[in-house]
């Protein structure tokens, strides 16, 4: 009975160490490709400026989908543009992540009800990992979303699907409204 005969289990020391090294390398060198379509693209460009210095997080923007592992969809996705979004997503190598930035790409924005030409959320055509709300969201919000993507990468394991990792991340997230309400109750008591 050698090491290979024993089989690979979820809690194997070797696999756990490999998971940690791979995840550290992925989250420390995140290469996003911006797909700016409207107002949110201006905030995305501001985030890439020297004021916020994304390179300190290991985030270096790329212009080719074949070199990127994160797609930032920012702005209103029209029906004509949807085909191009899917094509770019399919050209990205695995593992690939998608961050939807702003109300328009999250749910259609102000055009959701009467805009027949607007897609009611980019998640209808490609899987989205992290949503950043706002119209348009501030650069700080985008940085928070990028850090959520890094948390998601940190939690990935060999043999565990991304859907399970997303569930774990959602369980760890704290709703600020709950924290404020708990603090109010503590002050009243």
Swiss-Prot record:
It catalyses: a quinone + NADH + 5 H(+)(in) = a quinol + NAD(+) + 4 H(+)(out). It holds the Pfam family Oxidored_q6. It comes from the Bacteria. One of its GO terms (molecular function) is iron ion binding. Binds 1 [4Fe-4S] cluster. [4Fe-4S] cluster binds at residues 39-40, 104, 135. Keywords: 4Fe-4S, Cell inner membrane, Cell membrane, Iron, Iron-sulfur, Membrane, Metal-binding, NAD, Quinone, Translocase, Transport. It is a peripheral membrane protein. Its cofactor is [4Fe-4S] cluster. Its EC number is 7.1.1.-. Its main location: membrane. It is found in: Cell inner membrane. Belongs to the complex I 20 kDa subunit family. NDH-1 shuttles electrons from NADH, via FMN and iron-sulfur (Fe-S) centers, to quinones in the respiratory chain. The immediate electron acceptor for the enzyme in this species is believed to be a menaquinone. Couples the redox reaction to proton translocation (for every two electrons transferred, four hydrogen ions are translocated across the cytoplasmic membrane), and thus conserves the redox energy in a proton gradient. This is NADH-quinone oxidoreductase subunit B. It comes from Chlorobium phaeobacteroides (strain DSM 266 / SMG 266 / 2430). The lineage of its organism: Bacteria, Pseudomonadati, Chlorobiota, Chlorobiia, Chlorobiales. The gene is nuoB.
């Amino acid at each position: 009975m050698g090491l290979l005969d024993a089989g690979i289990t979820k809690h194997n020391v070797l696999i756990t160490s490999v998971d940690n090294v791979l995840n550290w390398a992925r989250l420390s060198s995140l290469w996003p490709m911006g797909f700016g379509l409207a107002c949110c693209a201006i905030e995305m460009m501001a985030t890439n400026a020297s004021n916020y210095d994304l390179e300190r997080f290991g985030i270096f923007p790329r212009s080719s989908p074949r070199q990127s592992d994160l797609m930032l969809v920012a702005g209103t996705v029209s029906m004509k543009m949807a085909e191009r979004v899917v094509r770019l997503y399919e050209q990205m190598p695995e593992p690939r992540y998608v961050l939807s930035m702003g109300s328009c790409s999250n749910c259609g924005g102000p055009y959701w009800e009467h805009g027949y030409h607007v897609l009611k959320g980019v998640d209808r055509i490609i899987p989205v990992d992290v949503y950043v709300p706002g119209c348009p969201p501030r650069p700080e919000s985008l940085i928070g979303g990028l850090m959520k993507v890094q948390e998601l990468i940190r939690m990935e394991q060999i043999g565990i699907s991304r859907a399970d990792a997303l569930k774990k991340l959602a369980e760890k997230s704290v709703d600020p409204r709950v924290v404020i309400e708990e603090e109010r109750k503590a002050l009243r008591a």
